Amino acid sequence: MLDVGHTSKSEGATSARDRPEFAFNLHLAQRIEEKLKAAGFAGTKLLVTEGNARSSLVKRVAVANSLPADLFLAIHHDSVPNKLLEDWEFEGKKLHFSDRFSGYSVWVSRNNPEFKTSLSFAELLAKAMKAQGLEYAHQYTQAIMGHYQHPILNKETGVYSYDQLVVLRKTRMPAVLLEAGSIINRDEELKMDSDERRDIVSGAVAAAMKKFCDARSAPRPDVAATTPPQDQPAAKPEQAAKPEAVSR
């Protein structure tokens, strides 16, 4: 399940050029949906929620928990605390920006009932983003972030924990949140609004999803090693049946 962060009424952060985060989230999520379905994940569902911030969180968790989803992936774009914003003028309007930070980040909650599986996909996604030449956002371990400061779980790839985030904590399936990049950074905003960057990010998600599903469908060593019934001879290695591919 692909969750489009925020709503048309509660649009999230505002970009350096005065565009709502919700629009960035929707366009990227739609591209990821296309990429996943083209890769064979036909059951991919796009979740677009209406309402204000708090009620939409409750709604999206309720919808996710009512469906047989194997994974919940929330799509967002990043900003900075208000104290780090600077002023500039764009097209005759006084706006805010911060070029101090850039990059993606991947988030999980250690309070999710499927935390280990959530972390497994988060690691795959972060590695896939890094493999595309993207850098992760390092600032979330810094005191300057105030109450946005969070512990990092993987310093190599940019996986963080946000234990109390509702959509990560209360979903009953593995849940991960992707901050695809910073839209308050003037240069990165332009990149995030390009088809090229949306293709790069959606490709990383699809690559991570394939590895995630392949690992889950592989036979467990303890199951493969079980002793066959006594009245049936054990199959020779070259005769053993291959596991069927799992429908995505």
Regions found by a protein language model. Give the residues of each.
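Short glycine-rich His-centered loop
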Residues: 1-18
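Active-site-proximal helix/loop segments of hydrolytic enzymes
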Residues: 23-248
